[in-house]
């Protein structure tokens, strides 16, 4: 009644402002609907479905313009083609991780369609290794623990920040590539970004994890493959 009386007694200009404020307060008091319990979509012909607890960002869909991707707010069916979907997981449990927590130290898995196939993966590797000089490339070594080739390069933008580059090939076929970045603040390597193609080479898996988990990369890659397969339905 007090709000109604105030509206009745106010001047025209102030009435508008008061009415808007009243509506805003009433809208704010409405309960926020919880997100859908599942996030689903199709990547390269395979339908995937995950608990929304894994998904820290809005999924991006192929039929959205680049300026709309990841903006969310649209209810999508599971038949919609995904452009990119990221999952935050605790390691080694692979349970949903709280990506926005300051204590989050898990892995982030991104699944995307990949029309470029092995050629595209090799081109990305060429870009990574271009940060190493010819002399550094000649000094590359095979890391037996990881089962990967390794070479140290330098960030092209920040010369004082080294980069560790990893890759593996089989019969001339690029299987996986990775790069770990140096943290000047911590004075050590900090985060790693690896990627590999799924068996049909039509989808790519990108995994970000901490430097301290590098020795477990083989297990990370293997278990993530199993996790994705268990949540995918072949179309």
Give each language-model segment a name.
Residues 20-144:
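Charge-rich, low-complexity N-terminal segments
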Residues 190-206:
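Extended hydrophobic
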Residues 139-188:
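Signature of long, low-cysteine stretches enriched in small and polar/charged residues
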Residues 1-13:
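N-terminal Sec-pathway targeting helices
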Residues 46, 84, 184-188, 198:
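Secreted/processed peptides and extracellular or luminal domains of membrane proteins
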Residues 202-235:
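Surface-exposed amphipathic alpha-helical segments
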Residues 37-43, 166, 194-198:
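Short acidic-hydrophobic surface loop/beta-edge motif
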């Amino acid at each position: 009644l007090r709000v109604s009386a105030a509206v009745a007694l106010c001047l025209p200009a102030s009435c508008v402002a008061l009415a808007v404020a009243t509506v805003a307060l009433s809208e704010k008091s409405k309960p926020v609907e919880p997100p859908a319990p599942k996030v689903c979509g199709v990547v390269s012909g395979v339908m995937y479905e995950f608990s929304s607890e894994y998904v820290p960002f809005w999924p991006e869909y192929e039929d959205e313009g680049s300026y709309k991707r990841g903006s969310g707010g649209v209810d999508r069916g599971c038949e919609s083609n995904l452009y990119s979907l990221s999952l935050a997981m605790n390691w080694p449990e692979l349970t949903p991780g709280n990506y926005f927590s300051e204590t989050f130290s898990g892995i982030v898995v991104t699944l995307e369609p990949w029309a470029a196939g092995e050629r595209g993966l090799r081109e990305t590797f060429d870009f990574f290794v271009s940060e190493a000089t010819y002399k550094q490339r000649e000094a590359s070594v095979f890391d037996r623990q990881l089962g990967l080739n390794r070479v140290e390069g330098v960030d092209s933008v920040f010369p004082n920040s080294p980069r560790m580059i990893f890759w593996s090939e089989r019969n001339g076929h690029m299987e996986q590539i990775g790069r770990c970045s140096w943290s000047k603040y911590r004075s050590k390597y900090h985060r790693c970004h690896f990627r590999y193609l799924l068996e049909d080479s039509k989808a790519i898996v990108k995994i970000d994890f901490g430097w301290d988990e590098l020795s477990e990369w083989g297990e990370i890659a293997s278990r993530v493959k199993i996790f994705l397969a268990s949540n995918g339905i072949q179309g």
